[in-house]
Swiss-Prot record:
FAD binds at residues 67-76, 85, 149, 178-180, 348, 354-357. Keywords: Disulfide bond, FAD, Flavoprotein, Mitochondrion, NAD, Oxidoreductase, Redox-active center, Transit peptide. Binds 1 FAD per subunit. It is found in: Mitochondrion matrix. Disulfide bonds join 76-81. The lineage of its organism: Eukaryota, Viridiplantae, Streptophyta, Embryophyta, Tracheophyta. It catalyses: N(6)-[(R)-dihydrolipoyl]-L-lysyl-[protein] + NAD(+) = N(6)-[(R)-lipoyl]-L-lysyl-[protein] + NADH + H(+). Its cofactor is FAD. It comes from Pisum sativum (Garden pea). Its main location: mitochondrion. This is Dihydrolipoyl dehydrogenase, mitochondrial. It holds the Pfam family Pyr_redox_dim.
Length: 501
């Protein structure tokens, strides 16, 4: 019912009950036939792929998922989102013990980092979660094939298994969910020792005295924070004139100041033009992005974090004629169909935010379409989070984007310095910023900088998804004392006046 209501509000039409019955009867006959052919085959077992596989099985499809890594969860779970959050939390605990415990009357001395134990905790979390997904596959009767798949035809996938065998998996519907890979930089060769990708940065055996991060995006700032908290001198080199270019400008400025207070150094409007790894460390030659005098930056380790690129290598897309754009992204329609009948794509390999949760939503929506249901993902309302301390989270448009539309708008802000819970825990850095259309009060964007912004942002995400106004949020009773009261106060500031400032 909720999906039906949302579809009507958004202007989408639901399929008729006759169409749904026909769709389900087709699936039931295919599933019961005992055929070797699958209803759905997914290439890739990351967030998009494994979620699509489970949902497809739940909808009654005979489903197989092919994953080359040998462990489910993709980049996110194995060498991305999850291990980085484990290290962010561990490094934050160390930093708090050294710098904040005393403020709360907790006296500690000789606080040390056991890097091996820290890495062990991270690895344990990853292992537990990958095994958990395998358990979900068994529970939902998803066939799991470990190996590298490539198209033989639009309905056949040749798989070189990790056991060294070859098998062909057939499917009526093939979903490409192969994710993305690290984007390389010309002249900078990643060896995962001195020059590392995010994968290597998650597994360093020693704390580098000097770490240079190339790229001031989400991943670079998070990994820079991990190593900076436990002793590294961190310098971030960024080609653009600002960090995290997609972030609201006002929030970005405060965020950069916060990181600088923590010791992170920034060289903006700077490009890397040379790399020398002949000595014990690395010497980077840099110059202004527009050209100019060159300087040398020395480091023990260099992290290349210049973005990601769709991973479609070896899939034989050319053989079956799947179209891609100039960035290598697979082109799909609103139902995630490619130009080749029976072949679909989701997640990082298609246009849209390269985020794990976006890929998951793609996966669910795609298989719902296959089942005759309504599936939809609004990429303008996908939340994003930088998991530093403080965290920065946002959903919807930035103030700069709203200005470009020409729509008249209002802005309401509320600082955590005026929030009782934030003051009580002695962690009151940051603010909530809400942007709403002036005429209708409809919320257009919400931006939060706070210790737990990633958790707070979802109230705003729901509001945007259902076209709520700032007054709608302001009139919801929020528990006291909580950090979420800052959202209520910012909403009050947007359409009227806040109480506590």
């Amino acid at each position: 019912m909720a999906m039906a209501n949302l579809a009507r509000r958004k202007g989408y039409s639901l399929l008729s009950s006759e169409t749904l019955r026909y769709s389900f009867s087709l699936r039931s006959r295919a599933f019961a036939s005992g055929s070797d052919e699958n209803d759905v085959v997914i290439i890739g077992g990351g967030p998009g792929g494994y979620v699509a596989a489970i949902k497809a099985a739940q909808l009654g499809f005979k489903t197989t998922c092919i994953e080359k890594r040998g462990a489910l969860g993709g980049t996110c779970l194995n060498v991305g989102c999850i291990p980085s959050k484990a290290l962010l939390h561990s490094s934050h605990m160390y930093h708090e013990a050294k710098h904040s415990f005393a403020n709360h009357g907790v006296k500690v001395s000789n606080v040390e980092i056991d890097l091996a134990a820290m890495m062990g905790q991270k690895d344990k979390a990853v292992s537990n979660l990958t095994r958990g997904i395998e358990g979900l596959f068994k529970k939902n009767k998803v066939t799991y094939v470990k190996g590298y798949g490539k198209f033989v035809s639009p309905s056949e996938i040749s798989v070189d298994t990790i056991e060294g065998e070859n098998t062909v998996v057939k499917g009526k519907h093939i979903i490409i969910a192969t994710g993305s890979d690290v984007k390389s930089l010309p002249g900078v060769t990643i060896d995962e020792k001195k020059i590392v990708s995010s994968t290597g940065a998650l597994a360093l055996s020693e704390i580098p005295k000097k770490l240079v991060v190339i790229g001031a995006g989400y991943i670079g700032l998070e990994m820079g924070s991990v190593w900076g908290r436990i002793g590294s001198e961190v310098t971030v080199v960024e080609f653009a004139s600002e960090i995290v270019p997609t972030m609201d400008a006002e929030i970005r400025k405060q965020f950069q100041r916060s990181l600088e207070k923590q010791g992170m150094k920034f060289k903006l409007k700077t490009k890397v033009v040379g790399v020398d790894t002949s000595g014990d460390g690395v010497k980077l030659t840099v110059e202004p992005s527009a050209g100019g005098e060159q300087t040398i930056i020395e480091a023990d380790v260099v992290l290349v974090s210049a973005g990601r690129t769709p991973f479609t290598s070896g899939l034989n897309l050319d053989k079956i004629g799947v179209e891609t754009d100039k960035l290598g992204r697979i082109l799909v329609n609103e139902r995630f169909s490619t130009n080749v009948s029976g072949v679909y794509a989701i997640g990082d390999v298609i246009p849209g935010p390269m985020l794990a949760h976006k890929a998951e939503e793609d996966g669910v929506a795609c298989v719902e379409y296959l089942a005759g249901k309504v599936g939809h993902v609004d990429y303008d309302k996908v939340p994003g989070v930088v998991y530093t301390n403080p965290e920065v989270a946002s959903v919807g448009k930035t103030e700069e984007q709203v200005k470009e539309t020409g729509v008249e708008y209002r802005v309401g802000k509320f600082p955590f310095m005026a929030n009782s819970r934030a003051k009580a825990i002695d962690n009151a850095e940051g603010l909530v910023k809400i942007i709403a259309e002036k005429e209708t009060d409809k919320i257009l964007g919400v931006h939060i900088m706070a210790p737990n912004a990633g958790e707070l942002i979802h109230e705003a995400a729901i509001a945007l998804q259902y076209d709520a106004s700032s007054e709608d949020i302001a009139r919801v009773c929020h528990a006291h004392p909580t950090m979420s009261e800052a959202i209520k106060e910012a909403a009050m500031a947007t359409y009227d006046k806040p109480i506590h400032i």
